[in-house]
C-alpha cells in the first residue's frame, strides 16, 4: 500500500466543523457557490480527505460558509 502525503492540513478540521454544524457537503458547496467560489461536492470531499489543495480564498470562503473564524481550522 502506498501512502499519499496530505495535500492540505485543514481538510479534516473542515469536515469536523461541517458535521458538527449539521451541514452536508452539498449544502457547503451551495454556500460556497453563492460566494462565487466554484467548489462542488466532489471537490469538498477531496479537500476533507486531504487529496486536494485548498487556496487562500477558498479557506476564507469556508470560514464564511461555516460561520467560524479562519483560526478554527488550525486548532
Residue ranges and their predicted role:
Residues 1-9, 74:
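A detector for short, charged/polar N-terminal pre-domain segments
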Residues 14, 28-29, 44-47, 73:
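Conserved hydrophobic/aromatic packing and binding residues within compact polymer-binding modules
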Residues 14, 25, 41, 56-59:
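Helix-turn-helix DNA-binding elements, focusing on the entry/boundary residues of the two helices
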Amino acid at each position: 500500500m502506498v501512502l499519499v502525503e496530505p495535500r492540505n492540513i485543514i481538510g479534516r478540521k473542515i469536515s469536523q466543523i461541517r458535521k458538527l454544524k449539521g451541514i452536508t457537503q452539498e449544502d457547503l458547496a451551495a454556500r460556497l457557490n453563492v460566494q462565487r467560489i466554484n467548489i462542488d461536492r466532489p471537490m469538498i470531499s477531496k479537500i476533507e480527505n486531504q487529496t486536494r489543495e485548498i487556496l487562500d480564498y477558498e479557506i476564507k470562503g469556508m470560514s464564511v460558509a461555516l460561520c467560524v473564524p479562519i483560526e478554527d481550522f488550525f486548532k
